């Protein structure tokens, strides 16, 4: 079984360990198709079978000795018969602010803020950085369903599913998580009906960002992404994430790259499309250009209007504009006004040394959680560095751009065999 610290690959042939309990032996008849285990889920063939853990957490508890910490969750539910919706799943607090969007149970105000902050954060391996349930945890179990990016901490599975569950999972060859299982209940952990709808509603209602997120897409409904890339070609970044296949004639995503959009009109963009993602950027630092930096933003905004789907469309549509630290303060204020969202500053720090940074305007979820302002001294240092950089650097995969695109794995098909580390 793979974890964040000890990744492993799935065995092609092994005996599936079935730990079903009577209460979890059937799927939820009221769940919509997208939340049920599909009749033929992609990549989960018989020869790639995966282990399941469906424990019963109702082991004996001593009423005279109430536990401390998160252990109080099982005590309150099993001994005091408290409704789990009145307990924070993340920390065990009884000061519930709202309902947890993914699983039955409450969530307190501090944990709600942490949940929203970490929801779309990813590590270099392409999986989410924090536990799907409590948004913490140092060592995490990685769901090994090919199309899932979620992780779970040892504490959550032992407390909410049952003591010793983490050891059972760790001993398995492959493990699929509680949002991928065909059964909705594992111990105290009850997956919510229509949890993707619940997650979107929770984010839109409680999140600080004025930009609404799209409902995440079930793995078997995801389609290859169609990208319009302006001024800068992100072909390498998309391929390294698995969104584009390297071989020609494949069923992977598509990329339309346009360097000069001066004479591009709406009819041409509509003919090229439709698109799921529009990318644009100012020129990289150190490159000479006849255009002023503000020109790139205005042209990006113009083409973006041509590429947008109809207002009544439910299609997830994303856009991202990257400023390579060229826009003036006035330009940045104008960009905020036109794109109707604040900028996020992302830094590439390696070994405590600032390697690169950029400002990003986008509706891709999760980017604000990595916002880190640059000091004037840091920005000046980057400006100085680019004078000595080789233009060959532009041929490398941009790790900051890759980081921005990682959340799109929740919406579009990607090909795991093509994925490379950041």
Curated annotation (Swiss-Prot):
Protein name: DNA (cytosine-5)-methyltransferase 3-like
Ranges of compositional bias, category Polar residues: 1-11
Stated role: Catalytically inactive regulatory factor of DNA methyltransferases that can either promote or inhibit DNA methylation depending on the context. Essential for the function of DNMT3A and DNMT3B: activates DNMT3A and DNMT3B by binding to their catalytic domain. Acts by accelerating the binding of DNA and S-adenosyl-L-methionine (AdoMet) to the methyltransferases and dissociates from the complex after DNA binding to the methyltransferases. Recognizes unmethylated histone H3 lysine 4 (H3K4me0) and induces de novo DNA methylation by recruitment or activation of DNMT3.
Keyword RNA-binding attributed: no
Chain ranges of the ADD domain: 76-208
GO biological process, one term: negative regulation of DNA-templated transcription
A Gene Ontology molecular function term of the record: zinc ion binding
Stored InterPro entries: ADD (IPR025766), DNMT3_ADD_GATA1-like (IPR040552), DNMT3_ADD_PHD (IPR049554), SAM-dependent_MTases_sf (IPR029063)
Region (Disordered): 1-50
Zinc fingers, GATA-type class: 87-117
Compartments, record wording: Nucleus
Biased composition (Low complexity): 20-30
Subunit and partners: Homodimer. Heterotetramer composed of 1 DNMT3A homodimer and 2 DNMT3L subunits (DNMT3L-DNMT3A-DNMT3A-DNMT3L). Interacts with histone H3 (via N-terminus); interaction is strongly inhibited by methylation at lysine 4 (H3K4me). Interacts with EZH2; the interaction is direct. Interacts with SPOCD1.
């Amino acid at each position: 079984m793979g974890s964040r610290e000890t990744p492993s690959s799935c065995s092609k042939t092994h005996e599936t360990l079935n730990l079903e309990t009577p209460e979890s032996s059937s799927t939820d008849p009221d769940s919509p198709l997208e939340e049920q285990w599909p009749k033929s889920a992609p990549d989960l063939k018989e020869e790639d079978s995966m282990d399941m853990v469906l424990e019963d957490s109702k082991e004996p508890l001593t009423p005279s000795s109430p536990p401390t910490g998160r252990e109080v969750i099982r005590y309150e539910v099993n001994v005091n018969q408290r409704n789990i919706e009145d307990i924070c799943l993340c920390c065990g607090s009884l000061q519930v602010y709202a309902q947890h969007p993914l699983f039955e149970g409450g969530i307190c105000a501090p944990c709600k803020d942490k949940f929203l902050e970490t929801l779309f954060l990813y590590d270099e391996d392409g999986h989410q950085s924090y536990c799907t349930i409590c948004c913490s945890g140092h060592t995490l179990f990685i769901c090994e369903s090919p199309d899932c990016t979620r992780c779970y901490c040892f504490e959550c599975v032992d407390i909410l599913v049952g003591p010793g569950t983490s050891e059972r999972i760790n001993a398995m060859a492959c493990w699929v998580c509680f949002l991928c299982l065909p059964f909705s209940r594992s111990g105290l952990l009850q997956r919510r009906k229509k949890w993707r709808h619940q997650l979107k509603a929770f984010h839109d209602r409680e999140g600080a960002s004025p930009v609404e997120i799209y409902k995440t897409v079930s793995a078997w409904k995801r389609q290859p992404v169609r990208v319009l890339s302006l001024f800068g070609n992100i072909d390498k970044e998309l391929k390294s994430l698995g969104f584009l296949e390297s071989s020609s004639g494949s069923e992977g995503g598509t990329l339309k790259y346009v360097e000069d959009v001066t004479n591009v009109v709406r009819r041409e963009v509509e003919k090229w499309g439709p698109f799921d993602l529009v990318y644009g950027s100012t020129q990289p630092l150190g490159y000479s250009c006849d255009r002023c930096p503000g020109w790139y933003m205005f042209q990006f905004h113009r083409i973006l209007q041509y590429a947008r789907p109809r207002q009544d469309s439910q299609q997830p549509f994303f856009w991202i504009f990257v400023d390579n630290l060229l826009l003036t303060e006035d330009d940045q204020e104008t960009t905020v006004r036109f794109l109707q969202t604040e900028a996020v500053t992302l830094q590439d720090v390696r070994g405590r040394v600032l390697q690169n940074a950029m400002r990003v305007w986008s509706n891709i979820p999760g980017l604000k959680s990595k916002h880190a302002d640059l000091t004037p001294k840091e920005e000046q240092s980057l400006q100085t560095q680019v004078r000595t950089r080789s233009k060959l650097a532009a041929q490398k995969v941009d790790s900051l751009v890759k980081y921005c695109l990682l959340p799109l794995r929740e919406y579009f098909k990607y090909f795991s065999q093509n994925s490379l580390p950041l």
